[in-house]
């Protein structure tokens, strides 16, 4: 099974799939300033501690670090500012309902470019316990051994 090469992938939050059971995913646009999109295209973004917060009828991407643009001047952006996500009202309502449940988090999974626009794939996830993480690692190792043994 060959993996597809994704040239437009900017950043991926690998820790998210390790820490959460992802129930559903939604693609959203991000409202960025000029220096932010230049930094994103230069792959200077970190999703590790990011999450999505919904308030005031809008969804915001919080705690995602987009480094300042190197050639930027005094009008450079704040690296940790809240960034508005571009979603339909029905999608925001569905995410708000999910967020109100206990133990549910909305987290960014990956950032990529699509037709020249920056998009973020956000996932609705339920936190894993420590034994769930160990079980996932055990299953992954077993699958790897089977593939190695039978050459699949």
Swiss-Prot record:
SUPFAM superfamilies: Small protein B (SmpB). Keywords: Cytoplasm, RNA-binding. GO terms for biological process: trans-translation. The keyword RNA-binding applies. The keyword Cytoplasm applies. It is found in: Cytoplasm. Its main location: cytoplasm. GO terms for molecular function: RNA binding. PROSITE patterns: SSRP. Belongs to the SmpB family. Required for rescue of stalled ribosomes mediated by trans-translation. Binds to transfer-messenger RNA (tmRNA), required for stable association of tmRNA with ribosomes. tmRNA and SmpB together mimic tRNA shape, replacing the anticodon stem-loop with SmpB. tmRNA is encoded by the ssrA gene; the 2 termini fold to resemble tRNA(Ala) and it encodes a 'tag peptide', a short internal open reading frame. During trans-translation Ala-aminoacylated tmRNA acts like a tRNA, entering the A-site of stalled ribosomes, displacing the stalled mRNA. This is SsrA-binding protein. It comes from Lactobacillus helveticus (strain DPC 4571). The gene is smpB.
């Amino acid at each position: 099974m060959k993996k597809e090469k994704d040239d437009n992938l900017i950043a991926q939050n690998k820790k998210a799939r390790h820490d959460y059971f992802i129930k559903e995913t939604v693609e959203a646009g991000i409202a960025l300033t000029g220096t932010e999109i230049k930094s994103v295209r230069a792959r200077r973004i970190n999703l590790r501690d990011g999450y999505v917060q919904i308030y005031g009828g809008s969804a915001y991407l919080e705690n995602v670090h987009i480094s300042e643009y190197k050639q930027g001047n005094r009008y450079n952006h704040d690296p940790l500012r809240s960034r508005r996500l571009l979603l339909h009202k029905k999608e925001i309502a569905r995410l708000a309902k999910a967020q109100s449940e206990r133990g549910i988090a909305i987290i960014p999974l990956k950032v990529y470019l699509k037709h020249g626009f920056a998009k973020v794939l956000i996932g609705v996830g339920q936190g894993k316990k420590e034994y769930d993480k160990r079980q996932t690692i055990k299953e992954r190792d077993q699958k790897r051994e089977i593939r190695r043994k039978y050459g699949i």
